[in-house]
């Protein structure tokens, strides 16, 4: 028996009734809210909605009337593999959403490792501490290789040449400069003999800076000479033997060799 149907003015003829498969529209219809519940559920409950869909409504005896050529072979994919694939894709999407977006114009500055350092406060000395006694200055360490503080190591003056004479090519040293002042009596308010025969002399506590200033002019220094620098040069002479420190305050002693050379040069000076 043929069943004829009209559709938009065209006549459609159905196949023979022997090959006709009954189709129940209500059997395969599924409400839309089921699909929304599938999308909104978590990953663990997806498999329940997905794999129970066909097993709940479709029965094996309904497909017995279909010939073999009406079926399409599906790929053999196990449900656990599909669940793992879906969870992997879901985790990637969550990772993309959680990643903060950095503006392209934002520049990342280079971070420099911070290393803390300990800083000690600088202690300023009052004028009273700066003008300390010569014994306290003797306790401080002097540069081991320096003979004097910026002092030029010139040659010994030859016979007939006055120490510090203008136009002289020989550079005077500190102990020679002090010996000349003591023997000439110049600046006797700043330096004087304690024992001339032993070569012991002493500086004035009030006028020692004036003597140091004159020594700086004699050397031609650009920086101001102080007694502290001059005393350090005298202590360095204690290592070479020309001058040594005496226990008495601001007191020093020439060596016998320096006194002998000074006496020889004094005897050879031309008479006035």
UniProtKB/Swiss-Prot annotation:
Keyword flag DNA-binding: yes
Tissue specificity annotation: Expressed in spleen, thymus and bone-marrow macrophages.
Domain of life: Eukaryota
Subcellular locations according to the entry: Nucleus
Principal subcellular localisation of the protein: nucleus
Regulation (activators, inhibitors): Transcriptional activity at macrophage-specific genes is inhibited by interaction with GFI1, which results in inhibition of SPI1-induced macrophage differentiation of myeloid progenitor cells, but not that of the granulocyte lineage.
Residues the record lists as Phosphoserine modifications: 142, 148
Listed GO biological process terms: anatomical structure regression; apoptotic process involved in blood vessel morphogenesis; cellular response to ethanol; defense response to tumor cell; endothelial to hematopoietic transition; erythrocyte differentiation; follicular B cell differentiation; germinal center B cell differentiation
Keyword annotations: Activator, Developmental protein, DNA-binding, Nucleus, Phosphoprotein, Proto-oncogene, RNA-binding, Transcription, Transcription regulation
Involvement in disease: May be involved in murine acute Friend erythroleukemia. It is a target region for SFFV proviral insertion.
Family according to the record: Belongs to the ETS family.
Functional summary from the UniProt entry: Pioneer transcription factor, which controls hematopoietic cell fate by decompacting stem cell heterochromatin and allowing other transcription factors to enter otherwise inaccessible genomic sites. Once in open chromatin, can directly control gene expression by binding genetic regulatory elements and can also more broadly influence transcription by recruiting transcription factors, such as interferon regulatory factors (IRFs), to otherwise inaccessible genomic regions. Transcriptionally activates genes important for myeloid and lymphoid lineages, such as CSF1R.
Record text on subunit structure and interactions: Binds DNA as a monomer. Can form homomers. Directly interacts with CEBPD/NF-IL6-beta; this interaction does not affect DNA-binding properties of each partner. Interacts with NONO/p54(nrb). Interacts with RUNX1/AML1. Interacts with GFI1; the interaction represses SPI1 transcriptional activity, hence blocks SPI1-induced macrophage differentiation of myeloid progenitor cells. Interacts with CEBPE. Interacts with IRF4/Pip and IRF8. Interacts with JUN. Interacts with RB1. Interacts with TBP.
Protein name, entry field: Transcription factor PU.1
Species of provenance: Mus musculus (Mouse)
